Every structure is written in C-alpha cells, then in structure tokens.
C-alpha cells in the first residue's frame, strides 16, 4: 500500500507541476486586466526590446523633444541617450502588465505609484493636439497588446510592440499628424524616433500599423465627420415587409461593418452596399452616430499618471466617429365609404386628388 501511495503521490505532484508550468506559460493577457479609473499600479522596467534579428533597439545618441506644461504650451529640451530601449511595466494585484509611454523624454523610474484615468478625463491627454490624440488612439488600436502575435511575417512581438511605441511618440511629439505625414516640427527632426527602427524588422510592423490606421480613418462616402455636415437619406416603405429601408453605396469602399448609435435602426452590408432598415416610421430626421465594427481585443484605453513622471497608456479606444441622418417617407392607408341619400351607391365614381 505504501509503495502504491508513493507512486500515486508522485504522479499527482507531477500533474500539479505540469499545471503550474502551463499557467506560467500563458500570455499575460490571458488574465483580464482593467478598464477601471482610479486603479493604482506600481511602475517598473521590463526586458529590453530584442528584434527578430537578435539586436536591441536603440535611440539616437542625442535628440530633442517637446515637453507640455499644464496649459498645453510646449518647450523643447535635449537629452543624451543612445541606450537600448526597455519595456515599461505596471503591477497591481492582478499581476504585471506592459504599457506604453505617451510622454517622451520624461523620467520613468521603478517603484512609482501610478493612477489610471479615462482618456477623456486625463488633463495631460486632453492637452495634446487633436491630431495627436487621434493618432495615439489609432496606433493603440492596431498596435501590439498582451497576447497578440505580430501580423507581419518574419517579425516578433518585440518588433511589433516597439513599432507601436515609435508611432505613439511621433504623434505625441507632433512629428506626425496623419499616417501618411511625417515631418520635422518645433526644431525636432522628423526621423528622431523612426531612426531606431529604420532598416530593422520593426520597420515592417511600423509600416503595417500605419497602413491599417490610414484605412481605418477613411469613412464611408455617404457619411460626414461633422454632425453639422451630415446628409439626410430617406428610407422607403416596403408594403410586403412592412418596414422602411434604403441601400447606400460606399464609393470609398471601406468594406467595414458598422456599429450604429440609433436604436431601432438595423444595418447590413454586402460588399460596399449598406442597407438600413427601420420597422417604425421616423417622423423627423435623426442623426446617426456610427463607427466601424472593430474587435479591439483589449481593455478600454487608460492614461496612467504619476506627478513629475512619464505618462503612460494602456488599452485602446476607437476615436473615429462619422455621421449621417435618416428619415422615412410618410405612408398611410385610407378608408373611403360611399353613401347616398337613397342608399344606392353602386356605380358612383369618385375623383381623388392631392399632392401626396
């Protein structure tokens, strides 16, 4: 019996060890993190970024960067660098998670206490130019997050993550205002950050992310970016289906499914044809807010702040909204009853006229 117990005990212990090793091998994102404001984390440095070519990613030996004050005004500073770039980590009671820097040039130290805020409530993030906010958010949408593999053949997750970080810095430093526009600004060279990945595997990921961002920023041809410029489209009544519908063609060929804000309105897509349907009459035009239906596969974007230290960001949120207005044609039924003094109505003709 003792021998049998020892054998079974060894088997049980081996099974437990295998389970522990399997759990440890899971990517960090297998455990949900947070989209919660007011969450506290402690900062630390992670490993160095190592490209799929086996080399570190390094910054320029010296470079200049802009710093934002509390009112959004900027000053230009310079720093000696050339160091290999490391990952930024945040730790809370759920574990340790990799985040991105959204404030280039400012100190990031181990052991600082950070607090999370929604991007809309972060005073730091809101003082960035609108183009910079949009760019950072879209880079996070298509960039690396825990648990994601690189979409570019021949590259690894460090290449993908470092490319994401590079694009975030370019927007935050006002060197980029769109996926296709990289330029010098405020005396800072356009290639200050791109320098680190030029000719390296991460450059392929960098190009891929920017192409996805450009595609995402393109909206359907029947929509407008501004509510005040939204066109109105009238849904026609279908007596057979007893509903109202209209099909619109997107000549921009975004080929994206849509998520609508308006209740009671359904949308389906076939290629670049979008069919909008309502079961009820719309008595006056309604403005529909829409977004592309994208699976972000991560938590909502949070800005992590610590007084006097580098501002960080995690998660992703879609900043691209577009608008159009929908109306329905009026449709009704009428009942005409023929009457006469003598009760004989057969053969009586009516002439109905109107502008409807």
Where on the chain are the PLM-derived regions?
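Acidic/charged, solvent-exposed loop-and-adjacent secondary-structure segments enriched in E/D, K/R, S/T
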Residues: 176-330
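C-terminal segment of classical bacterial N-terminal signal peptides
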Residues: 22-31
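Short, surface-exposed polybasic-aromatic patches that bind anionic ligands, especially phosphate groups
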Residues: 33-215
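Structural motif
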Residues: 246-252, 335-349, 355
């Amino acid at each position: 019996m003792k021998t049998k117990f020892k054998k079974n005990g060894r088997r049980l212990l081996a099974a437990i060890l295998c389970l522990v090793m399997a759990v440890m091998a899971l990517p960090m994102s297998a455990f949900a993190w947070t989209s919660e404001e007011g969450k506290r984390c402690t900062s630390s440095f992670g490993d160095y970024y190592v490209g799929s070519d086996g080399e570190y990613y390094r910054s320029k030996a010296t470079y200049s960067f802009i710093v934002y004050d509390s009112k959004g005004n900027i000053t230009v500073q310079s720093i000696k660098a050339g160091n290999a770039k490391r990952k930024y980590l945040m730790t809370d009671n759920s574990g340790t998670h990799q985040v991105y820097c959204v404030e280039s040039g400012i100190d990031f130290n181990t052991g600082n206490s950070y607090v999370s805020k929604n991007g809309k409530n972060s005073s730091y993030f809101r003082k960035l130019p609108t183009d910079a906010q949009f760019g950072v958010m879209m880079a996070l949408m298509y960039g690396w997050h825990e648990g994601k593999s690189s979409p570019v053949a021949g590259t690894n997750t460090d290449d993908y993550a470092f490319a994401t970080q590079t694009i975030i810095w370019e927007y935050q430093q006002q060197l980029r205002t769109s996926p296709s526009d990289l330029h010098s600004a405020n005396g800072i060279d356009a290639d200050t950050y791109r320098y680190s990945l030029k000719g390296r595997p991460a450059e392929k990921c960098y190009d891929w992310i920017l192409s996805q961002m450009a595609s995402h920023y393109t909206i359907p041809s029947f929509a407008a970016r501004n509510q005040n410029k939204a066109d109105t489209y009238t849904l026609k009544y279908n007596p057979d289906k007893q509903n109202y519908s209209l099909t619109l063609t997107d000549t921009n060929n975004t080929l994206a499914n849509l998520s609508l804000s308006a209740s009671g309105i359904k949308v389906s897509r076939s290629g670049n044809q979008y069919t909008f349907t309502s079961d009820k009459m719309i008595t006056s035009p309604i403005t529909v807010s829409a977004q592309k239906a994208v699976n972000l596969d991560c938590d909502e974007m949070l800005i992590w702040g610590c007084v006097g230290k580098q501002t960080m960001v995690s998660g992703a949120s879609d900043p691209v909204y577009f608008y159009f207005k929908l109306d329905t044609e009026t449709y009704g039924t009428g009942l005409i009853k023929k009457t006469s003094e003598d009760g004989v109505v057969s053969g009586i003709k009516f002439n109905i006229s109107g502008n409807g």
